[in-house]
Structure formats: C-alpha cells, structure tokens
Amino acid sequence: VCILEKNISSPERICGGGMSAAVQNWFPFKLQPIVDEVITNVEFSWCNTDKVVAELSGSSPFWIVKREKLDSFLLDQALNAGCNLLTTFNVVNIKKISNVWQITALDGRQVEAKAVVIADGSQSPWPKTFNLGPNQQKFASTYSGRVKRKGNLRDETARFEFGLVKNGFAWAFPLKDAVNIGMGTFLDNKNSISVEEILKSFLPDLGLDTSEVIGEEKKLRVWNGHSKLNGEGILLVGDAASLCDPFLAEGLRPALMSGFEAAKCLLYWLDGEVNDLDSYTKTIQKNWGNSMAWGKRISQVFYRFPKAGYQLGVKRPTAPKRIAQILSGEM
C-alpha cells in the first residue's frame, strides 16, 4: 500500500472533530490516546436561549478529537504496518493501462497500482472524471475555527445552536485546552455564511471573543442520494464519496467507515475471492446511505423552517435523546 499525500500536513487541521466512539469497532488498536474529550451531555439552544440539555447514554459516547492528531495517529499506524508514504505528490492524472493504474504527479513522478482509493476530500475532481458519486453534487457552506481556551463551555458538553445560522446551525465542541467552533448552512449550494456576524452573537455566550478565533470557510460535499462508489479497481471514500451527513454534518465517522469497508472489499478482490468491487457500493448504501436518505429529508424540513423545527423537534421530550443516539452511533 502506498499513500499519496498532496500537502505536508499543517500543524493544525481544524474541523468539528466530533465522532461516535463506535468507530473503535473498525480498528485493531485503541483510539483513546488521541481523544481530547468524551461528551456525556449535549446542549441545544435557539439564538443562545431556550436551551435544552440531553444526556448521552449507552456504551458509545461522542468523542471530540483534534483532526491533526487523528490524521497523524492513523498515518503512524499505517506506516508501522508497512505502508509507504509519498509526500507533496500532487496528482494530476489517473489512467488505466491494461489492468494497471498509472498515477502521475505534477512534478512528473509516477506510481503504478492494481487499485486506487480516492480519498482527497470534498474538492476532489476525480469522482466526475470516473463518473462515480452522485450525478449532482451537493455542498454545504461551512466554517471551522478554534479558540485556544475553553471559556465557559462545560467539560464533556457539546453545544448546538440552531437560531443564528440561516438554513443551518453552529456548534462548539470542547477539547482539553481549547474549543472547536463551527457552523454550516445546508439547503442551497450558493448559500454563504455571515461568519463574523454569527461569531459576534455566538461566542460571547460561550465566554469567548471573536478576536481569539483562528479558522477558515470551506465547501463540504454532503450526501445527495445513492450512487455508484466503485469502478473496476477504483473506489471513493469519505468526503470524496459525498458521505457527509446532510443534517448534522458528521464526516469523520463515514470517512473511517468507508475506509474500513474499502480495505475489506479490496482484500477480497485482490485475493481473487470476488470478481468486482460492487459489494463496496452496496455495503455503504446499506450501512450508511439508507440513514442519510432520512437525514436529507429531515434536513430539508428542519432547516427550511428552523424555528418550528426547534420547537416541534428539538424541544419534544424524545427529540434530544434521538439526536444523542445519532451522535453516539446508535441510530
């Protein structure tokens, strides 16, 4: 296995960092060393008021990680297991010659392989090139930031704010010594976010100030219908496969899950136990896509009528528990 990395990882890779502890089931090694915070309570608010708190129950809590620590940890595990790594490998061409894939970098370097896994995120050009993924890509406009102190955000508590962001929500996830701040809007590919305006309203309620935030805006590719995720010797995983949850913007769990399922399918295929990789698409549809179909429907209603959604949805006695179950991977 050879990992082709376009950029040398920056010291910080800021994202929400939330994922269900159920992801541990896909790894033969413990992930706890890179978990910054274990969430036991989720707080919901409407314009910083009308707050509702839900307790996470069950055996799979919600974990918060620093993305840079997670990436580095998983890369180290892969290298220790015998993977090779090529850095600053900016892929400009992928083509198949006979039964061998040829991958070419901007600087002229070439790699040949029996199979290719496309894992280069929401801006990946390759799904269109190989006619994989949804016919119409759906993007959420998002902002991810970090404040290097915790303010008054309580330990083990994640915050979801539904009133300040048009057609979306904002969040605050605690780390050991910081807070991951974010927001997203989900209904229209052309939607933009008034980041500064929202931060000025949201951060003071957390005991934080806008001058303390370091972050960036980006487009996040979200699930937009069942689609083919594999070709002959080629697979899409993670954001490149449009697997991000269209309701709560959860991206880490489907990225890790799809990586696990891709590896399993490739192993059977390379060993000659199966003739194609079609089982990968079917497995992702069954284990993730069917839930995302419901997530898309909920998103379309909730974010189009957010105040009614908050009153009739989040404030219903059973709703916080349901959202907590989604976050912990039980639904």
Task: Give residue spans per PLM region.
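C-terminal helical "tail/cap" subdomain of flavin- and related membrane-associated enzymes
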Residues: K264-M331
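Conserved N-terminal helical subregion
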Residues: E37-V38, F44-T129, Q136-A140
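Hydrophobic "anchor" residues on beta-strands that sit immediately upstream
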Residues: V1-C2, Q110, V116, L235
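A short coil-to-beta-strand element that immediately follows conserved catalytic motifs
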Residues: L85, Q137-T142, G207-K219, L277
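Glycine-rich FAD pyrophosphate-binding loop
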Residues: V1-C15
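A short alpha-helix-loop-beta-strand transition element characteristic
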Residues: S9-P11, F27-E43, P134-F139, E273, ...
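Conserved FAD-binding catalytic core of PHBH/FMO-like flavoproteins
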Residues: G121-K200
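FAD/FMN-dependent oxidoreductases across multiple families
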Residues: N93, Q110, N189-L266
